[in-house]
Curated annotation (Swiss-Prot):
It comes from Equus caballus. Phosphorylation sites are present in the extracellular medium. The gene is C9. Homooligomer; about 20 C9 chains oligomerize to give rise to a huge beta-barrel that forms a 100 Angstrom diameter pore in target membranes. Component of the membrane attack complex (MAC), composed of complement C5b, C6, C7, C8A, C8B, C8G and multiple copies of the pore-forming subunit C9. Membrane attack complex (MAC) assembly is inhibited by CD59, thereby protecting self-cells from damage during complement activation. CD59 acts by preventing incorporation of the multiple copies of C9 required for complete formation of the osmolytic pore. MAC assembly is also inhibited by clusterin (CLU) chaperones that inhibit polymerization of C9. It comes from the Eukaryota. Keywords: Complement alternate pathway, Complement pathway, Cytolysis, Disulfide bond, EGF-like domain, Glycoprotein, Immunity, Innate immunity, Membrane, Membrane attack complex, Secreted, Signal, Target cell membrane, Target membrane, Transmembrane, Transmembrane beta strand. Disulfide bonds join C43-C78, C54-C88, C57-C94, C101-C112, C107-C125, C119-C134, C142-C181, C380-C404, C510-C526, C513-C528, C530-C539. The keyword Signal applies. This is Complement component C9. The keyword Transmembrane applies. Residues 510-540 form the EGF-like domain. The chain crosses the membrane at residues 235-242, 265-272, 374-381, 382-390. Residues 99-136 form the LDL-receptor class A domain.
Length: 547
């Protein structure tokens, strides 16, 4: 069986890690001890604060509360907002500051642009108001030169959330060009792309590298650490993960509306990501009741690199309006809602591409019984193949169906018969709807033959839907324009909000696990990852060795 796909990319890293309990004995549960099983703990929140004074400009008042204890041991998790608002009639007048564009043109969005940008065919205003009332044909900056819009450039600068959630929107208007026609050539496809104003540099680079790594872990928590290591290395964070927004009300209540800071479009590229909450909970649900081995397959494809401008960046009208809508007096709920929408940090530079990451849950006992080794499974899935760039950037993966047959003394074992691979957990990021949904559909149907062919298919779609795969981060509050009203105060408030955000959802609000278990907080619920010799919702049940 073979599959071939042609696609352009910069770096292809196929990394295989083995996360395993090692050569540990099998255990069976001892008789249940009811006294050791903790009762469910429901989410507990503090009382609401008093309502704030009525903000004269926003015509709203606010209140907040805190999470005291997260749900744990099958109790109700914390899913409600910590902030609240309501309309009010102010008793003071609002001191509004009108935008003055001077000799420049004022857009319908309020943006100020140079008059030389009028009637050039570009959407410099963001609402095309600069292209109204044009008597003559547009004067496009690129004239007769052929250029295309870059999906890498559109994605550049996207934010990251310190607790792991993908931001709902981007602050940058990367479809603004300031009347320039800076072209960047993709050496793979020989296509010229137009570089947006916000990017100081954009490079399509072509490199190829492969790295195979095998590691063994004796406890599940060590496997979990390896999966979330990137986020922890960025922020020195504890085991707290939050993937579901609870404060960004606009995007929750109006799912059909665009939360991207730009107009919705039928042609908008879909960037796929599986539900991280469900994925991590599924991963943690595999206890050490039976000896498991986790085959961690990671393929990183880098398409290019970018560096954002350090000053004079053009931000989306939505981002600026949301900053203006923040109360000058600190209100925890409102500022956390802003962080959940745009991220706690943005990418000042980084790499774009896709992350192909799967975790195969292997049944170690069945492998031993049938004489199947780890390298046999790797060979069957095709992850021992060389993936190297050839002429015209063709990547071909050839899988022999006989590689999935293992002969032992008694029989011929089919590795794909279902008894060796318990599950496939996906952490894939990037790629278009077509290949991402095909793979998701395959997993939902219980397929356990996700292999290198699926990797090649997915990789071929990344040019159209890249995501950030590595970045240098800067706090989101650094983007507040210094000339905006109350800019200094709101910057200080956002600094405070990031600290409050970390403390509000800290794992310290969980009860400890028993017998050396590690507590992990995911989306308002505390879970226990148990050592090899224990199991249960609190690691309260010991396992006796099976002779």
């Amino acid at each position: 069986m073979s599959a071939g796909r042609t696609f352009a990319f910069a770096i292809c890293i196929l990394e295989v890690s083995v996360l395993t309990a090692g050569p540990t004995p099998n255990y069976a549960p001892e008789p249940e001890q009811q006294s050791g099983t903790p009762l469910p703990i429901d989410c507990r929140m503090s009382s609401w604060s008093e309502w704030s004074e009525c903000d004269p400009c926003l015509r709203q008042m606010f209140r907040s509360r805190s999470i005291e204890v997260f749900g744990q041991f099958n109790g109700q998790r914390c899913v409600d907002a910590v902030g609240d608002r309501r309309q009010c009639v102010p008793t003071e007048a609002c001191e509004e500051v009108e935008d003055d564009c001077g000799n420049d043109f004022q857009c319908g969005t309020g943006r100020c642009i140079k008059k030389r940008l009028l009637c050039n065919g570009d959407n410099d205003c963001g609402d095309f108001s600069d292209e109204d009332d044009c008597e003559n044909d547009p004067r496009p900056p690129c004239r007769e030169r052929v250029v295309e819009e870059s999906e890498l450039a559109r994605t550049a600068g996207y934010g990251i959330n310190i607790l792991g959630m993908d931001p709902l929107s981007t602050p940058f208007d990367n479809e603004y060009y300031n009347g320039l026609c800076d072209r960047v050539r993709d050496g793979n496809t020989l296509t010229y792309y137009r570089k947006p104003w916000n990017l100081a540099s954009l490079a399509y680079e072509t490199k190829a590298d492969k790295n195979f790594r095998i590691e063994h872990y004796e406890q599940q928590i060590q496997a979990f650490r390896s999966v979330i290591e990137e986020r922890r290395s960025h922020f020195n964070a504890d085991f707290t993960l939050k993937f579901t927004p609870t404060e960004a009300k606009k995007c929750k209540q109006e799912p059909e509306e665009s939360c991207n800071g730009t107009d919705s479009s039928e042609n908008r590229i879909f960037r796929f990501a599986y539900s991280k909450n469900e994925t991590y909970q599924l991963f943690l649900s595999y206890s050490s009741k039976k000896e498991k081995m986790f085959l961690h397959v990671k393929g990183v494809i880098q398409l290019g690199k970018f560096v954002m401008r350090s000053r004079d960046v053009v931000l989306t009208t939505t981002f600026l309006d949301d900053i203006k809508a923040l109360p000058t007096a600190y209100e925890k709920g409102e500022y956390i809602a802003f962080l959940e929408t745009y991220g706690t940090h943005y990418s000042s530079s980084g790499s774009l591409g896709g992350l192909y990451e799967l975790i195969y849950v292997l049944d170690k006992a069945s492998m031993d019984q049938k004489g199947v080794e780890l390298r046999d499974i790797q060979r069957c899935l095709g992850f021992n193949l060389d993936l190297s760039l050839k002429d015209k950037y063709e990547v071909t993966a050839k899988i022999d169906k006989n590689d999935c047959l293992k002969r032992n003394e008694k029989e011929i074992v089919n590795i794909m018969d279902g008894s060796l691979i318990d599950d496939v957990i996906s952490l894939i990021r990037g790629g278009t709807r077509k290949y991402a949904f095909e793979l998701k559909e395959k997993l939902l149907k219980g397929a356990k033959t996700v292999n290198v062919t699926d990797f090649v298919n997915w990789a071929s779609s990344l040019n159209d839907a890249p995501v950030l795969i590595s970045q240098r981060l800067s706090p989101i509050y650094n983007l507040i324009p210094v000339k905006m009203k109350d800019a200094h105060q709101k910057k200080q408030n956002l600094e405070r909000a990031i600290e409050d955000y970390i403390n509000e959802f800290s794992v310290r609000k969980c009860h400890p696990c028993q017998n050396g278990g590690t507590v992990i907080q995911i989306d308002g619920q505390c879970l226990c990852s148990c050592p090899i010799a224990f199991e249960g919702i609190a690691c309260e049940t010991g396992k006796k060795k099976i002779s």
